[in-house]
Design a protein with these regions (language model features):
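Short helix-capping/hinge SLiMs at alpha-helix to coil transitions
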Residues: 1-4, 130
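An amphipathic alpha-helix adjacent to DNA-recognition modules
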Residues: 5-17, 24-51, 59-62, 66
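Regular secondary-structure segments
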Residues: 42, 46, 66, 120-132
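Amphipathic alpha-helical packing segments from all-alpha helical-bundle domains
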Residues: 56, 79-124, 145-148, 152
Length: 158
């Protein structure tokens, strides 16, 4: 298996059993294809996750990431792939936090929520870099407060 940076459009087209022309009809390059792929994960998460509980949102996110462990690890070894994955995480985390606060996706996170989102983002990236050995539920229990009241208090203190 190759790291994403070394995968060519020819490799992707061959694996998908389509012609390169067909690939280029839909995508301008492999990074646009990766962006689309990550957006599909986001839609999958949104459909799968009707919860307003932030910890359940995070558990679902970690489960999806771990389910696609090999792909995620290969994506993170390269600047552009890492950047796209990081953007995906930012969007997902912001949406989860807003939803758990009963806000719209278009609303802006307050400072406490931004601080929390950046911290969670860093923890997830570190977990990915270390090979995702901890089960998602164990990672959450080690990392986050045992109640969402603590998180709500953090949001309101800023």
């Amino acid at each position: 298996t190759k790291y994403f940076e070394s995968v060519s459009v020819k490799d992707i087209a061959s694996h998908a059993q389509v012609e390169r022309q067909t690939f280029y009809y839909y995508f301008s390059d492999k990074y646009q294809c990766l962006t689309f792929y990550l957006q599909q994960w986001g839609k999958l998460l949104a459909e799968r996750d009707g919860s307003t509980n932030l910890q359940q949102h995070l558990l679902n996110l970690l489960d999806v990431i771990r389910k696609h462990k090999e792909a995620i690890i290969h994506i993170t070894y390269g600047d552009q792939g890492y950047s796209l994955l990081s953007s995906f995480l930012d969007t997902a985390l912001n949406e989860f936090i807003l939803q758990s606060e009963g806000k719209k996706k278009t609303d802006t996170l307050d400072k406490g929520a931004q601080f929390f989102a950046y911290g969670v983002h860093g923890i997830i990236i570190e977990w990915i870099k270390k090979g995702m050995n901890d089960e998602p539920s164990i990672l959450l229990s080690k990392t986050f407060p045992s109640s969402t009241e603590s998180v709500d208090r953090l949001f309101s203190e800023f």
